[in-house]
Amino acid sequence: MNQEVMNLFNQQAQPQSFDQIKISISSPEKILSWSYGEIKKPETINYRTFKPERDGLFCARIFGPIKDYECLCGKYKRMKYKGVICEKCGVEVTLARVRRDRMGHIELAAPVAHIWFLKSLPSRIGLLLDMALKDLERILYFESYVVIEPGLTPLKERQLLSEEEYLRAQEEYGEDSFTAMIGAEAIRRILMELDLEGIATSLKEEIATTTSELKPKKLMKRLKIIEAFQLSGNKPEWMILTVVPVIPPDLRPLVPLDGGRFATSDLNDLYRRVINRNNRLKRLIELRAPDIIIRNEKRMLQEAVDALFDNGRRGRVITGANKRPLKSLADMLKGKQGRFRQNLLGKRVDYSGRSVIVVGPELKLHQCGLPKKMALELFKPFIYARLDAKGFSATVKQAKKLVEKEKPEVWDILDEVIREHPVMLNRAPTLHRLGIQAFEPKLIEGKAIQLHPLVCAAFNADFDGDQMAVHVPLSLEAQLEARVLMMSTNNILHPANGQPIIVPSQDIVLGLYYLSIVADGSVGEHKADDKNNPMQGVFGDIGQLEHALAAKSVSLHSKIKWRWRGLGPDGEPVSRIYDTTPGRVILSGVLPMHPKVPFDVVNKLMTKKEISAMIDTVYRHCGQKESVIFCDRIMALGFSHAFKAGISFGKDDMVVPENKWSIVEDTRTLVKDYEQQYNDGLITQGEKYNKVVDAWAKCSDKLAAEMMGRISAVQKDENGADKQVNSIYMMSHSGARGSPAQMKQLAAMRGLMAKPSGEIIETPIISNFKEGLDVLEYFNSTHGARKGLADTALKTANSGYLTRRLVDVAQDAVIREVDCGTTNGIKMRAIIDAGQVVAPLSIRILGRATAEDLVAQDGTVIVKTNETIEERHLPAINAAGIQEVKIRSVLVCQTKSGVCATCYGRDLARGTPVNMGEAVGVIAAQSIGEPGTQLTMRTFHIGGAAQIADSSFVESSFEGTIKIRNRSLAKNSDGDLIATGRSVAVVIVGPDGTERAVHRLQYGARVRVDEGDTIKRGQRIAEWDPYTRPIVAEVDGIVGYEDLYDGQSITETTDESTGIAKRVVIDWRGSSRTSDLKPAMLVLDQDGKPVKLARGSDARYYLPVDAIIGLDPGAKVRAGDVLARVSTDSAKTRDITGGLPRVAELFEARRPKDAAIIAEKSGSIAFGRDYKNKRRLTLTPHDGSDAVEYLIPKGKHIHLQDGDVVELGDYIVDGNPAPHDILAIKGVEELAAYLVNEIQEVYRLQGVSINDKHIEVIVRQMLQKVEITDGGDSDILTGDQIDRTELADFNEKLLAEGKKPIQGVPVLLGITKASLQTKSFISAASFQETTRVLTEAAVNGKVDTLDGLKENVIVGSLIPAGTGSLAADIRSIARRRDNLILQQRSAENAANAAELSELPPAAAE
């Protein structure tokens, strides 16, 4: 009995399970069915009694009682009257909680248009009626009448009439001869009378017959919305409201403040306005007030309802008493503070605490130190339960008292409770999944949380006052997940690139580096030629060595011989003698015993890179447990030796090179020389600037190299033994702290500085910090520092926003199946930039599955199809000299709604094949977004020291023989080979005949090699001036000018500072007289006729604006000589500042500012008639299809001449190509390769490594949609965009029925657009543009099937990824089985019925 009573009291609403959510426009009947009563008065509560007014906005009769089980007048109290309705005050006796979900309504005296369907672009009402929004507003806000039924009058249907026109028409045709109405009633009437089917049929006919370009698009839009209404079951007139719902009062509370005032939700003000105006309107109608007054009141009612739904969308924003705009219903959903992002996606949690972190070097990797006070508070319920179970307390109250008094037994119990109960630590900002990790708590005194030093890198934490939050996983499942998936020991590798993230840094690195140094001539070293003491410095076991170290008869750095005992390749014990040092032997003592981890792993100088590689080796071969133990051990070793070494530095450790001033003087002379050249008019101002900056950059580099040489050199003492290495060099070289760039500023020269605008200041800072800066230099250096700080603040926000968009677009990319079975793949090759291999093939294909057998030249199969390429395969692949590998990629994965494990490859954070249900999309987004923030925070570390962008030569990175493709080279007057073609490529062929590298040469480059030459590594292939683009003659002859008229298309400018004249092409399009000039330089023969080129056209070279002409008419010219040159922009510093916006631009698939123009087909070029201020260029394809025309702005430099032949995909105008063009011209694979390379380029510049597959996942999500080019036999319209998977499903059906399939081309969407076009409207609405998304979803009656992660978080169910994917799978299997059982049953029933009907009648009885 007792139990039942308790159950009655604690009746929780049972959570309902549902599979999908539908949204549609609500009908007036629906609104009334939700409502518990009409609200007739604007009053809220009585200010004296604090009781709600009857029929007011808080009415208890409508919305329910204020206190649990108590009516308003107090006649019925307590549980026993549950469900009774009080006859005096009309309140139902029930829980007060119903005030959170009971709604009311307001009956409007005049219909009102719903502002979302009217004003949210495109206006749905406008599209449906085919009327302009302006006209609709004039009708709705009572400015114009609309003709509804013209009758026999000459008026047209839906014609707008002003007041005068309406009255005139009534006089002219009689009052009853036509019907015209005004206001929302008119619109409602028109909407009700719409014949949707008829309109749809006529629209389809019109689309089929229309000839114009733009019309079908407009008609399609209208047809789409009409079909949406037909399919969704919404009625058009529902977009006009006759009833307004009122949300429950507890969701718009009114709270009394002290001092008799009230704080209220803005919604109450907005509702009050609506009720007041509605009641006034009712009264005016009853009083039969003049039309004009009623009309004004109706307009005000419309405005009040508009403000309630979406304040500020139309007209003035309605403000409250304090001039602050009121928050309407739409504002409640929108933005960061709206319902979606504030409450549904991010919730506050209990059982959490936060405190400052301090370092805990004696912790194990899986532990964290938790202050006792904090633990006591966090684990309270567990402690109460344990106290109760152990009999220390009989009631919770007693247990509470014991805990409050902090009795000794409580601490013992706390120890028990905490044992093996992991807690989660989180540091904001959580940029990737390693920002939350689980640890086992260890109780400590004090109030700060202790953190293990090795996990700092993952959290990006330091101990300068950072705070961290602790969360307690409560349920057993949560504890299990925390331990198995989130424990810090399970997160050794970085999900972005698969390298270890548990890597020692700073002190530890310094200690290990110190430990592994070798010093010549140290005490007790082994000398092979020492006859007196041949066994000095020879050691056989560790005990002997430790003894010698303790006795100081040998130092840590002495060269010794050492017998190492370990395991051979077959796992048998072996021993070998090594030349090494005692320090390295100590280090080898912590290595795990394993055949693949020999002594060579530690027998080298341990820099940070080497340590990382060592941890990686141990992890790959010995597994996770060994690695964790090993990491803890090397940490302890590193700390202890760093402290014993006692490394510190003073000012004398900063060694300034002796020849500093001579180098500086040389550069100064060079700069003077450039100034002189400029004064003599040999070079332009821009060129001088570039050269000066270049000279100083070189000087600065040279000095830095000198200084590094001095600092890294090892000095000898008087006994000929090595002195200790320079401390600063040790810190920098080991990777503990500081970089060569910072050392350069300390001891060489600070170098060039950048202005805030990004330009480099010509005068560098010659002093270094040791010498000190003078005032001017100090001032120059402040620019960079300020810019750094300002940038940081701005970019943190930008980077966070980029991450948010990436997560949103990729959140539903989850591993759904093991293998999708596709045979497609993408081709991978090494990335070579300016002859340097920046990403070798082996790194790019590691951990990916092959799409075809990988075969060596002798026919042996190295890796079979669909097998993952592991570390063990790489030596064979490299040995076989394979240049290109076809691998599986998510870009070609055929899995519906997700990706498959084979296409994805290895899970980088585990080093194993990826698990089912892994949320690879979110991991990809975090991997790309996290370094964005990191980098932006790093801009100011080198304090604006300028790094110059362009390289001006290309060197070979291989040995081999030279072949030249598309050869068009000429020897110029100086005897140099000059590339006179656009597509000249130098190919380096290896000894085995494979192409090792292909370098496309810059037009006008000086080529240093020729066909058949042999080339060595590091040899120059070609060089060019990075600051100018030349226009080069292709034949010998005499210079001629064409259309170059002084003052019209060419001008002689005299430089003020030098007095030298030079000829520059000016913008000739300014006046109509000169607009059709085509300034050009010609190469003429002896008769003064243009020389014919090999391809048949004249040697005529069109000049762009600002070209500087180098030769006079009549001058002799050799092929390869420069006729004119165009200065390019001066060198800007490259910094991720350019980087982050660039990444965003690529992911958003925006057209770059001056996009390249790419040839759509292979063919020949001809110049046509100019059009206004554009050049017309015609491309005649080789395949005989229609010619393509390009209009190019006149100032743009077109480097093609008449008659040039271009290949498909060649650039006609240089620039950054637009991704859409690449997709259209070269296809998906090329586009993906371009995006991956461009994005990687930005990150590589900053030294961040991200695996390609992450970028591929995002690109896959950007390519989800297909644009229909031919609807086939379906009812899908041409030009529609549909999902790839939908297209496949449609075509499957059509082909099965023997019909014509749909044709489509892939479309590239930017990440924002792609996020807003996901199938799930809940996900899209919680991302951006909430109003627009919800309006569209409601009109279409969309159903959200809750497939993605975000929707499930919002509705509060388990996400279908990770451990939640299992639950989802089980549910789907259960559903399938239920269906099978139902089918069987129905089949059995049918069979039984059939049997019964077959029985003879007598037997049936």
Swiss-Prot record:
Binding site for Mg(2+): 462, 464, 466
Gene Ontology MF terms: DNA binding; DNA-directed RNA polymerase activity; magnesium ion binding; zinc ion binding
Catalytic activity annotation: RNA(n) + a ribonucleoside 5'-triphosphate = RNA(n+1) + diphosphate
Domain of life: Bacteria
Binding of Zn(2+) 1, residues: 71, 73, 86, 89
Keywords associated with the record: DNA-directed RNA polymerase, Magnesium, Metal-binding, Nucleotidyltransferase, Transcription, Transferase, Zinc
Binding site for Zn(2+) 2: 820, 893, 900, 903
A GO BP entry: DNA-templated transcription
Bound cofactor: record note: Binds 1 Mg(2+) ion per subunit.
Pfam name, any one: RNA_pol_Rpb1_3
Record-listed E.C. numbers: 2.7.7.6
Role played: DNA-dependent RNA polymerase catalyzes the transcription of DNA into RNA using the four ribonucleoside triphosphates as substrates.
PANTHER family in UniProt: DNA-DIRECTED RNA POLYMERASE, DNA-DIRECTED RNA POLYMERASE SUBUNIT BETA
Homology family: Belongs to the RNA polymerase beta' chain family.
Protein name per Swiss-Prot or TrEMBL: DNA-directed RNA polymerase subunit beta'
Species this protein is from: Methylorubrum extorquens (strain PA1) (Methylobacterium extorquens)
